[in-house]
Amino acid sequence: MALPIEGKLSMANNRIERLKSPSSSSTCSMDEVLITSSNNSSSICLETMRQLPREGVSGQINIIKETAASSSSHAALFIKQDLYEHIDPLPAYPPSYDLVNPNKEVRFPIFGDTAPCPKSSLPPLYAPAVYELTLISLKLERLSPYEISSNRSWRNFIIEINSTQLNFYHIDESLTKHIRNYSSGETKSEKEDRIHSDLVHRSDQSQHLHHRLFTLPTRSASEFKKADQERISYRVKRDRSRYLTDEALYKSFTLQNARFGIPTDYTKKSFVLRMSCESEQFLLRFSHIDDMIDWSMYLSIGISVSLDLEVREYPDYRIVPRRRRRRRRRRRRRRHTHRSESSMGSFSQRFIRSNSRPDLIQRYSTGSSTNNNTTIRERSNTFTAGLLDHYCTGLSKTPTEALISSAASGESSDNSTLGSTRSLSGCSASRSIASRSLKFKIKNFFRPKNSSRTEKLHRLRSNSSNLNSVIETEEDDEHHESSGGDHPEPGVPVNTTIKVERPMHRNRAISMPQRQSLRRAISEEVVPIKFPNSTVGESVHSPSPIEHLSVDGCEIMLQSQNAVMKEELRSVASNLVANERDEASIRPKPQSSSIYLSGLAPNGESATDLSQSSRSLCLTNRDAEINDDESATETDEDENDGETDEYAGDDTNDDTDDSNIGYAYGSESDYSCLIEERIRNRRRASSTLSCFSNIPYGTDDIKWKPAIKEISRRRYLRDSLKCIKPFLDSNDCLGKVIYIPVSGPTFETSNKIHFSNRQSLQKQKNHFLKGFIVGPTALIELNCKNKNAIVGTTKDAEDHGEDDGDGDDGEDDDDDDDDDDDDDDDEDDDDDDDDDDDDDDDDDDGQITA
C-alpha cells in the first residue's frame, strides 16, 4: 500500500535533518542519486528519486531547493550540464557517409584531399566579353554636365572596346599616307604637344589660353570610305602592339553607367551615335551604316557587363522594332498631291515669267493667299488625271492620228497650259522636275557629255518643257471638251496641211498680235521632225504663220517625244520578257501599238474606239497595280522617313519602274507575261495564311513547311535602326550616377598604372574611379546611404519617362509625331559647327571637381 504524500514529505525532512550533522555518514542505495557539494567533501544524499507521481516529484524538488537555500553550507543545485554529462559522458561524432548514404551511386563533394596546387599550374586564360576596333570621327560636346566643350571640331581616332573599357588612339601616319589630302582634324600645335607630352607638361592655364589664341584653324577631319576603313582596321588588328601603344592613347573611358543612342537632333552628319561616358558627352561618326549597327551591339554588351551583379540593373534593350502605323494609302495620296502641286506651281511660274497674264496669276498661282487647300487639291487631281489621260492617248495613237487631233484642237491649245500639260507623261514630268533640282545638277556637273540616245531624249524633253508655257482656263477647257478637240473629224485628209477655222465666241486674255508673235517664236524654235514609226513618208515642217494657220509647235514636239518614249519602253519590255522566258526559242516580232490594237478590235470598230479602250485599259492596269501595292503586307509595314530612306539605300524607285514596264505596249505574249509576273508578286507579297487557298488538297510540303522568307537588306537596316534608342543633347542627367577618375589609394594589392607619365587620369588605361551623383549645381559624392535611394529614384524616373514618351502603349493615334524618335541623321554637306576654336587642352579634360 502506497504511503500518502504528506507521510513521504515528513520522511524526507527527517533524513535531511539527520544528514546535517558533520559526523554522520550517509550511504545511499543503488537507486539513489548522489550529488556532490562544492563546500565540503561529504556526500549528501538529498532524496531518493523513486517512481512517484508527477505532482509529488515537483513538490519534493521545491522543498529541496528551499532547504538548500536556507542551509549555511549552500548545497549544490541540480544543474542540467551535470545531468547531461552523467547521462552521455562520451562525445558524439557524426555518422559516416556509408551509413547515411546506402546508395553508392550518389556521390557527395567530399573535400578530404586538400593538397596545395603546384606553382606551375596557371588559371584559365582571360577572354573579354567583347573586343573590336574600328575608325571613327569624334566630336566632343560636353566636358562635364555643367561645362560645354570649347573645341567642337571633328577628329579622327581608332576606337577600341575591350570588354568594359573604351579606348581612343591617334591614327599613325603610315596608315593614312595613301589617302590624298588626308586631315585628322588635329592642329599642328596639338600634334607637337602630343609628341612632346612625355617630356613637357603645360600645367599653367594662362599659358594654355595664350597659346590657344594664336592657334591657326585646321582643316576639317577627312571622312573615311568603307574600303579605307576596312583596310586600316585589318592592319591595326594584325599588329596591335605597334599601333595601339600607350603613347598613342588619346583617352580611356569606362563603360560603367554609360549611355548611347541616335542623336535625332543632329542632322549635319550621317551614321552618328551620341555617347555619354564618365563625365563627358561626345558624338561618334562611323564610315558606313553596317559599322554603326555593329558597334551599337558592342557597346550594349560592354555596358551590360561593366557593373557588379549586386548593383547591375536589368537591361532594357529594344529588341523589337518600334511599331509604326500603316498609313501607306494616306501618304501615297499626300505624295501625289504634293508632287502635283509642285508641278502646277512650276508651270504657273513659267507662265508668269513669259506671258505675264494678271488674270491667271490670281487663279493658278499656288502661293496666292486666296487659294485654300481644297481648291489646290482638286486642281492638282485634275492635273494628274489630265497627264495620265493624254499620256495613254498619245501612246495608243499613231503619229498621224496625233497630228490630226492636235490640228483639230487648233487655237484652243495655244491659249492653254493645262491642256498642253496633258501631253506630258507622268514619268517625264517627274524626271523633268528631278532634273531641275540642285542635287541633280551637282551630281551631273562633272559627268562627261556623250551623244547617246538618252542625252538626245533629255534635250528633247528640256526643249518641250521650255515651249510648254501656256495655261488654259477652266472655261476654255470645258469649251474645248464640248467642241470635241481630242477626237479627229472624219474625212480629213492626212497628207495635206490642215486648216482649222477659229472657234467663235471665245474669251481671249491675249490680243491677236501678241498671240501671233508668240506662235512665231515657237515655230522658229521647232525643227523639222519625222516620226519614227509613221506610215506617212512625209516629214512635218513648221509652216510660216503668214500663209495659213500652223499646227501648234508644242503639240508636234510633245507627240514626237511620246513616239520616242514609246520606242524606248517597248524595247525595255521586250528585253525584259526575253530574259525571263529563255525557254521560248522563237519570239514574235514586236508590233506597233496601233497595228496590235487594230488586230484585237472587232469588225466595225473605229481607231478612236481602240484608243479609248487602250486608254481605259492602261488606267485600269494602273489602278490594279496601286491596289496590289496597297494590299501587300511586306511593303505596307513601314514608310519612307528621313532616316530610313537615307540609310537603306537607293531603292525608292522600284514601284515606278514596275509601273513603267506595265505601260509598254508590245506583242500579245508580253501581256500574258506581265500578268503572270504580277500574280506571282502578289502571291509572294501576301501572307502565308492567304496562300493556303492556292495550295492543292493533300499537299503538306508547302502548308506545314513553308519556304523561309529571307529578309531584305533594306528591311534589316530599317529594323536595326529602330532598335536603337534616341539620345538627345537636352536629355536631363540630373540625379544620374557617373564615375570620375580619381587617384587611388597606395595599397600593395592595387594594380600598377601601366603608363603614368601623364597628368590626366583619362589618358591612362588603368585608373581608379569614384561614383558621383549629378546635382543641380555640383556633383554629390556617392556613398552607401544615398546610393540605393538615388539609384532607385532615377530608375523609376527613367521608366516613367519612357512610358510617357513611347508610342507603343496601345493607343492607336494617327499623328505622325511618334515616328520622329527613330529618325536618324540626315545627310548634309556641312562639316563642322560655326565654332572657330579648334584647339583642345588634352591635359585638362576629365578633371572635374565637385
UniProtKB/Swiss-Prot annotation:
Biased composition (Basic residues): 324-338
Alphabetically ordered keywords of this record: Cytoplasm
Compositional bias of kind Low complexity: 406-416
Stretches for region Disordered: 324-348, 406-428, 451-494, 583-659, 793-850
Signal peptide feature range: none
Every PH domain range: 194-306
Subcellular location as annotated: Cytoplasm
InterPro entries in alphabetical order: PH-like_dom_sf
Ranges of Polar residues composition bias in the record: 417-428, 605-619
Composition bias type Basic and acidic residues, residue spans: 479-489
Ranges annotated as biased composition (Acidic residues): 626-658, 799-850
Any one GO CC term of the record: cytoplasm
Family annotation (PANTHER family): PH DOMAIN-CONTAINING PROTEIN YHR131C (PTHR37283:SF1)
Note: Present with 172 molecules/cell in log phase SD medium.
Name of this chain's protein: PH domain-containing protein YHR131C
Lineage of origin: Eukaryota, Fungi, Dikarya, Ascomycota, Saccharomycotina
